[in-house]
Amino acid sequence: SYFGLRSFGVGERGGLHCFTLNGEPIFQSGLLDQGYWGKGIYTPETNRGMYDSLRQVKALGFNMLRKHIKVEPLLWYYYCDILGIIVWQDMLNGGERYKQYRINLGPFINLRLNDKNFESMGRGDPKSRAQYMAEAEGTIECLFNCVSICLWTPFNEGWGQFDSLAVCEHLRGLDTTRLYDHASGWQDMGGGDVCSRHIYFKKVRLKNDKRRVLALTEFGGYSFSDKNSGKKVFSYRNFASAQDYMKAFERLYMRQVVPAIKKDGLAAAVYTQLADVEGEINGIFTADWRCKGPAEDFCRINAALYASFDLVFKV
């Protein structure tokens, strides 16, 4: 057995809000991690492989992973604990069939739905809502002692979302030691601790929320063509070569994300995504854990994020 001592919180400076670790401001630079594995699909092939994948993340300068709508074996969280990787944990969303066009329009227009309209959000059945609450409560109970978990995300992009303000406060009553991103993406009801933005098809343009931490919780999704695969796979933007991909990746961060720290008080960024999965090749690692760019380039980009943040929140 083991234990860890740490505190997660929210700090403020000059009207801008940020995350804190043990009372000190910290920029959280992370990757969206859907938890798929090359051969095991939902299950890591080996414990060593699970550990090594996390070491690779840390070696590139990232300090956070957003575990996307999946709960991992406790060993995975232990490895994050000992390696010093912060974890944002999504709840499982679920729900019934919803009006898909309402959700799919989110990346393109600011269409905010009323999440008390349970039918339109795929939560018309009271049993479905009760099942969600039971699973969310069980997730907190199961993972409560995982030191690395900083934040819970009850809902993502409106998928099965319902009464998110009340749900968030109910879960906060079960765990007051962590922060909450009550509705990650485009169905923000103004609650929780995070103003959570997903931006894919447009330039990164943000606005200081004045009450909550401003976080870019999904963006990017770049890839480059694999002419040998013969498969049609999804990415948000595709490039002709690894060199073009890496140049675009750096431009995205240096020209859009880094400036948003000083201009808007951006305090966290979660790039989509950690590794390629079936049907999506927009990871910074391939499915067999080969990095798509030089480690020093990723480290330099992350160093620029941290330096810009320190000038705003620490100096």
Task: Tell where the protein language model's regions lie, with residue ranges.
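Active-site-proximal beta-strand elements of phosphoester/diester hydrolases
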Residues: F27-L32, S196, L214-E218
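Short, acidic/turn-prone active-site loops that include or flank metal/cofactor-
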Residues: M91-E96, G185-W186, Y200-F201, G220
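Substrate-binding clefts and catalytic carboxylate motifs of secreted carbohydrate-active enzymes
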Residues: M133-A134, S148-W152, L206-V315
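Substrate-binding cleft/loops of secretory-pathway carbohydrate-active enzymes
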Residues: W159-L174, H182-D209, F224, L274-R290
